[in-house]
Curated annotation (Swiss-Prot):
Similarity section: In the N-terminal section; belongs to the CRISPR-associated exonuclease Cas4 family.
Name of this chain's protein: CRISPR-associated exonuclease Cas4/endonuclease Cas1 fusion
Assembly and interaction partners: Homodimer, forms a heterotetramer with a Cas2 homodimer.
Organism annotation: Rhodospirillum rubrum (strain ATCC 11170 / ATH 1.1.1 / DSM 467 / LMG 4362 / NCIMB 8255 / S1)
EC supergroup of this enzyme: hydrolase
Textual note on the cofactor: Binds 1 [4Fe-4S] cluster per subunit.
GO molecular function: 4 iron, 4 sulfur cluster binding; DNA binding; endonuclease activity; exonuclease activity; metal ion binding
One of the GO BP terms on file: defense response to virus
Binding sites annotated in the UniProt record for [4Fe-4S] cluster: 44, 212, 215, 221
InterPro entries, sorted: Cas1, CRISPR-assoc_Cas1, CRISPR-assoc_Cas1_C, CRISPR-assoc_Cas1_N, CRISPR-assoc_prot_Cas4, Dna2/Cas4_DUF83, PDDEXK-like_dom_sf
Annotated binding of Mn(2+) 1, by residue: 112, 125
Region of interest: CRISPR-associated endonuclease Cas1: 248-580
UniProt-listed Enzyme Commission number(s): 3.1.-.-, 3.1.12.1
Amino acid sequence: MAPSDTPPSAEDLPSQGELALFAPPATAEDALVPASMVNAWIYCPRLAVLEWGRGEKARSVDLIAGLRAHQATESGPTPALPDPMVLREDQSLKTRRLSLSSERLGLTAELDLLDVEEGMVIPVEIKVGKRPSVDEGAYLPERAQVCAQALLLREAGYTCLEGALWFAESRERVTVDLTEALVTATLVATSDLRLTVASGRLPPPLDHSAKCPRCSLLPICLPDEIAWFRKGSIARTPPPPASPALPLYGQTPGARIGKKDYTLVIQVEGEADRSLALDEISEVVLAGPVSLTTPAIHELLRREIPVAWMSSGFWFLGSTGGQGPRSAAVRTAQYALAGDERRRQAFARDLVSAKIRNGRTLLRRNWRGAEAERQIALDRLARLAERATTAETTACLLGIEGEAAAVYFRAFPQLFTQAVTTLPAFAFERRNRRPPADPVNACLSLCYAVLTRTLSSALSIAGLDPWKGFYHTERPGRPALALDLIESFRPVLADSTVLMVLNNGEIGTNDFLYAGGGCALKPNARRGLIAAYERRLDQETTHPVFGYQLSMRRLIQVQARLLARFVSGDIPRYPHYCPR
């Protein structure tokens, strides 16, 4: 006799110490738990809540291999599974791709493969890798996933006495017996996941678990980084690498970008078409009159590759796709923090202090002027950074920030080589914008605009709202949170890039246009500056808090995720990036 798939009655339940609290049946308004998330919950509750409850996604090597293993089983059309009322006891067949749901069980599933043997239906779940050497033939998470599929088949009226797992690498099939214990474990996992997601609670990360290194959500979960705030040390080095994919910039007027198979095709009048694999693209940045076809937009949306739309002058206009998790949990916490004056002010104090300290570090490392002037500037910035940590009001912080900016930019010309300072075109007196009046300010403005776009994208992918900040005020067209996060990165990413291209002679005096009192880079110079910025993102740094090495590109992603963890309450404070 098949084990029961009904939650046990009160008389059947164990003692209070072992009490399993079952969620009520789902309604039409409730989300149903995918069978794969039953697997995830038993493997790691935090993984299941992040992926299903918070809508977080990430592609890993194992995930891609799993997709290929599934595709390998699809050799052609198969017959449809007959209705249970007409399925004969002597009927046998194989079929694929069946969707089942049950509000009573609170479950839903996409079944990979179904075997029908003499009227008995057997769900077959395909797994990449080899069969594990355990007595049950497979680990509990995988067996529970198959069990959930079997319960859905029973609920639909089919006879299902067992399930199966197919391990693609070792090419072995393992029978999953639907024991009473497995059914209960599956129902409890389903119920626990539904109740946890409904509560809005995010389970803590596993503690230095061997499960973490191969988890696709490791770069999102950040278990060791979060543990650092409890232990003061971190066990894993280095962090997961950033994706090898890079941004695609389109800025030639009249250029057209379309889709062909698994590539984007770039067409520019008078030039040969160029193709770029979609797997090699992390985001698309379009500046000015560059067109993107509808099929290309659809494919980018499916792959969750963001598209940033910029003006010809690289003012950020908006974005398509890449909006991060399909959940409002992190943003809800973000809006709550924005209304918490104490926490918001503490964040702002650390932010301004970090910005000043990073500017001071850039001056200290790149100074080419008189030593006496250097020490005066460094001492003033050190005092202002310290004052920022005790500022009581936003107005006071703004005053400190403004004073520090004046000291910093007054000293900025001392960072240029003599070859640059002797050129009148590169004379720099103060920071100006809208429009920038000289070549140095034009370079700074472009780098700041591109950096704002980079951070806006990273914040959105982390589940945050780039338009709602904690320090910068909200204005139309101004991504306040991106401008918050940019402060500590301005000196180390944008300003350092400008110094690099000017001091190395990559951009010269003939690379600028002057009109209406403003100054702008010519197209080739703009491409060169953006390329230098991207090279800077690929350079490695040591995280000042966690001690591991990572690229600046990966650092931005880590910092955006840490900010999401901070606003969600996972960590007590946000560790601003301040290189030693």
